[in-house]
Amino acid sequence: MHKLFILTGPTASGKSEVSKIVAERLGCTIINCDSKQIYQHVPTITDQAEYLRTNPQFGLYGYVHPSNSYSVGLWLEDAKREILLAWEKKSPAIVVGGSGLYISSLIYGLSEIPPADAHIRQKARALLSEVGNDTFFELLLRRDANVCKIDRRNSNQLLRAFEVFESTGVSIFSWRERCPKKRPFENCEVCVLFPPKEELHPKINSRLVDMINSSAVAEVEYLMSLNLPADAPIMKAIGVREVIEYLRGNISLPEAVEAAQRNTRQYAKRQYTWLRRQLPQDAQFLPTREEMVQHLVSRLTETEK
């Protein structure tokens, strides 16, 4: 039986660099599991190095237009296809990224809830944009008391709950009970690159400086030209909100960098918590890139024997 390897970890921990080294040594296939690195035309703000977009060993990087509607369900179907293609070619597959919802769907599966029509999705986005998260949450709570389980700051979960109720008249939580999850792959090994926070923070800070000194501002200008809704997934990429504030003249560029660094450190903190609590008990946590490379090369070599 094939074994699927999943490499995850907080932002800026070095997952892409590890995957590049392992791919070069073993010729394996790398499949993206970062919900922002799927997007085209914005490589700087999504931290897509050129090899991620051009090397045929790397899949699901930079292939979705920023204005296109895309979901975890669509990603999971794309990922399953890429994984099976790799195995058909006798290539080990490693899924790499830090997006919790994508990782969870791959490990535990998704409930088969009916998709919402496009006009209902539009209606939900327009309402959220008009009233904001708090009011949207309260409106939804009146329809479905179980919505109290959702973090009102999580726009994606609020929108999905609204869409499901509006489309079917049934709570998304009831659908999940009716349609239990089915694991896409039974044989998964999860590896977590988990550096100490005090080592990660300087890397986050320097990454944001490098982004701004590169083409991040131009990429955000491009996104603004598309007139995307504020809650579009790509508009939540690291640094986008802060650069928009700079471009609108509300803050200086150094203030935008400082705010992006602070917000990214807070995001990494949430990732640390999620990774500790939501992954299988046998997930392998390692603190350094070197240890992770050695571990993956060893495990992949053993598995392929």
From Swiss-Prot:
Origin superkingdom: Bacteria
Enzyme class label: transferase
Binding residue positions for substrate: T11, A12, S13, G14, K15, S16
Gene Ontology biological process terms in this record: tRNA modification
InterPro entries: Dimethylallyltransferase, IPT, P-loop_NTPase
Co-factor(s): Mg(2+)
Binding of ATP, residues: G9, P10, T11, A12, S13, G14, K15, S16
Catalysed reaction, written as an equation: adenosine(37) in tRNA + dimethylallyl diphosphate = N(6)-dimethylallyladenosine(37) in tRNA + diphosphate
Site (Interaction with substrate tRNA): S99, R121
EC number: 2.5.1.75
Stretches the record annotates as Interaction with substrate tRNA: 34-37
Molecular function terms from GO: ATP binding; tRNA dimethylallyltransferase activity
Annotated keywords: ATP-binding, Magnesium, Nucleotide-binding, Transferase, tRNA processing
UniProt function note: Catalyzes the transfer of a dimethylallyl group onto the adenine at position 37 in tRNAs that read codons beginning with uridine, leading to the formation of N6-(dimethylallyl)adenosine (i(6)A).
Quaternary structure (record): Monomer.
Family, similarity comment: Belongs to the IPP transferase family.
HAMAP family assigned: IPP_trans
Protein name per the record: tRNA dimethylallyltransferase
Organism: Anaplasma marginale (strain Florida)
